[in-house]
């Protein structure tokens, strides 16, 4: 429960309070109301709900519906003049985060918080950290793919970083379930829309940066994207940063006055020898590590997670065991066909991650290589040119372009746009299952491979704003082995 007096105090301390307006006019103080629930969904309110009117598409009709269900007061940046009191604020999203934090009893103070950001690798690093901490503690995890609030039951995540009301409700459930740590992926979008406003992490990890999520509904420029990624560093007590990433010197200067650990080529924490399924490290994580995920970048993700978990209480033995146990659904999953050709299923969904995926596969498969790829509709439009550029740099690759969450766009048009950046013929098969079947039928022996990129473990396609059932890349590939 939270009282009107408490929530006004929170807003005033954050300099986010304008006034309360009701039939009697303007009020700086207000009394007599308390709330047992928080909501931003007008269909889920009653007389004891504190409602947040948020979003560019919010309509007064939503409030009218809520009022018929008993709503007594709402918080908004706009007075909709509907006859009930309104708490007017300068920034509704910041208000949501701080009020949710207090409403749920400040659960962030009862958990050790670890956050990962980066253009790629967040989910893999989060899974590494989860398995490391699970050796001696009780970690919960909010990842792009799956969420667990009790370390036992996993469910599909809706957002990389949940909306603030959901985030703190889920954190509170983690505390109730006896969890000791929480591992999160924190997207640049989470900072852009203030989902984690006011939250301080015990350790923040910056894995890498490359152009992505740049478009009309995301970040207008790379500078804006990079800036919002860096906000995790400002909001973490200690940081772990990849010294091999672009713009590392800038980040090193930024974190010079806070506790920090670096890993990678310009640091003391390095991988000294690397095999397909093992590596040796020096520095704070010195030792031998077995790993199920192939690729040097996955070994670096393991190093990043290991350094973070070391600070959060994990032992070197915990870290070694955790790395050895980690598998990630939809990340570098490998199948073998009856003719011994390989099928790689991976979530690679931007130019940089695609380049790394192709490079890893080319190290191990020297025959005919076929790539199945698409790009999502109505977001991340810059990826399409990036995909074309990467494919152009791999001239021996046979490419079939297909659908990948086309949303409100025509998948054929998206494929044609990608193809326009490739200086050689490619095939377009918009039906993703048919594209996979065609590519697999072209494999002849153990040196050949099919690379299915983009969707990973997703068992749906986003079409016209809806999740449409899709068997999933891995299930389809297994069917045609």
Swiss-Prot record:
Q: Name one GO molecular function term.
A: UDP-N-acetylmuramoyl-L-alanyl-D-glutamate-L-lysine ligase activity
Pathway-wise, it operates in: Cell wall biogenesis; peptidoglycan biosynthesis
Residues holding ATP = 118-124
A Pfam family assignment: Mur_ligase_M
Catalysed reactions, semicolon-separated: UDP-N-acetyl-alpha-D-muramoyl-L-alanyl-D-glutamate + L-lysine + ATP = UDP-N-acetyl-alpha-D-muramoyl-L-alanyl-gamma-D-glutamyl-L-lysine + ADP + phosphate + H(+)
Q: How is it modified after translation?
A: Carboxylation is probably crucial for Mg(2+) binding and, consequently, for the gamma-phosphate positioning of ATP.
Which compartments does it reside in?
Cytoplasm
- The UniProt annotation puts motif L-lysine recognition motif at 404-407
Example GO BP: cell division
Q: Return the EC number.
A: 6.3.2.7
- According to its UniProt record, where is this protein mainly located? cytoplasm
Keywords, sorted A to Z: ATP-binding, Cell cycle, Cell division, Cell shape, Cell wall biogenesis/degradation, Cytoplasm, Ligase, Nucleotide-binding, Peptidoglycan synthesis
Kindly state one GO CC term assigned in the UniProt record: cytoplasm
- Residues noted as binding UDP-N-acetyl-alpha-D-muramoyl-L-alanyl-D-glutamate in the record, renumbered to the chain: 42, 158, 160-161, 187, 195
Please name the InterPro entries in this protein's record. Mur-like_cat_sf (IPR036565), Mur_ligase_C (IPR004101), Mur_ligase_C_dom_sf (IPR036615), Mur_ligase_cen (IPR013221), MurE/MurF_N (IPR035911), UDP-N-AcMur-Glu-dNH2Pim_ligase (IPR005761)
Q: List residues modified as N6-carboxylysine.
A: 229
As for what it does, the entry says: Catalyzes the addition of L-lysine to the nucleotide precursor UDP-N-acetylmuramoyl-L-alanyl-D-glutamate (UMAG) in the biosynthesis of bacterial cell-wall peptidoglycan.
Similarity comment: Belongs to the MurCDEF family. MurE subfamily.
Protein's name in the database: UDP-N-acetylmuramoyl-L-alanyl-D-glutamate--L-lysine ligase
Q: Which organism is it from?
A: Streptococcus pyogenes serotype M5 (strain Manfredo)
The encoding gene: murE
């Amino acid at each position: 429960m939270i009282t009107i007096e408490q929530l006004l105090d929170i807003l005033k301390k954050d300099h986010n309070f304008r006034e309360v307006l009701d039939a009697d006019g303007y009020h700086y103080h207000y009394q007599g109301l308390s709330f047992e629930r928080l909501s931003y969904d007008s269909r889920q309110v009653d007389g004891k709900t504190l409602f947040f009117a948020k979003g560019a598409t919010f309509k007064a009709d939503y409030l009218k519906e809520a009022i018929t269900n008993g709503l007594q007061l709402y918080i908004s940046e706009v007075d909709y003049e509907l006859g009930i009191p309104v708490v007017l604020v300068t920034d509704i999203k910041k208000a949501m985060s701080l009020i949710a934090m207090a409403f749920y009893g400040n659960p962030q103070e009862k958990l050790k918080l670890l956050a990962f950001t980066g253009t790629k690798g967040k989910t893999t690093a989060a899974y590494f950290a989860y398995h490391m901490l699970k050796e001696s503690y009780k970690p919960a995890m909010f990842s792009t793919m799956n969420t667990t609030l009790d370390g036992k039951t996993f469910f599909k995540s809706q957002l990389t970083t949940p909306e603030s009301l959901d985030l703190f409700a889920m954190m509170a459930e983690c505390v109730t379930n006896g969890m000791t740590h929480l591992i999160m992926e924190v997207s640049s979008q989470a900072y852009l829309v203030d989902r984690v406003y006011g939250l301080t992490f015990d350790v923040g990890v910056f894995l890498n940066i490359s152009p992505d999520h740049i478009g009309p509904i995301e970040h207008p420029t790379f500078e804006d994207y990079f800036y919002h990624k860096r906000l995790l560093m400002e909001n973490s007590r200690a940081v772990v940063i990849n010294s091999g990433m672009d713009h590392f010197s800038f980040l090193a200067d930024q974190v010079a006055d806070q506790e920090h650990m670096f890993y990678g080529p310009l640091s003391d924490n390095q991988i000294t020898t690397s095999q397909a399924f093992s590596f040796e490290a020096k520095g704070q994580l010195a030792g031998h590590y077995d790993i199920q995920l192939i690729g040097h970048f996955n070994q670096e993700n393991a190093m990043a997670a290991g350094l973070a978990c070391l600070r959060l209480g994990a032992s070197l033995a915990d870290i070694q065991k955790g790395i050895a146990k980690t598998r990630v659904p939809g990340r570098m999953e490998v199948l073998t066909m009856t003719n011994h050709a390989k099928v790689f299923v991976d979530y690679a969904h931007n130019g940089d991650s695609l380049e790394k995926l192709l490079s890893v596969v080319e190290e191990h498969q020297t025959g005919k290589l076929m790539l199945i790829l698409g790009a999502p509709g109505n977001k991340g439009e810059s990826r399409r040119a990036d995909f074309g550029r990467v494919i152009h740099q791999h001239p021996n690759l046979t490419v079939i372009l297909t659908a990948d969450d086309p949303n409100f766009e025509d998948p054929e048009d998206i494929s044609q746009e990608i193809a326009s950046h490739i200086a050689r013929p490619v095939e377009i098969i918009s039906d993703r299952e048919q594209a996979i079947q065609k590519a697999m039928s072209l494999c002849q022996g153990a040196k050949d491979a099919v690379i299915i990129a983009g969707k990973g473990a997703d068992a749906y396609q986003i079409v016209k704003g809806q999740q449409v059932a899709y068997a999933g890349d891995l299930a389809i590939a297994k069917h045609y082995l």
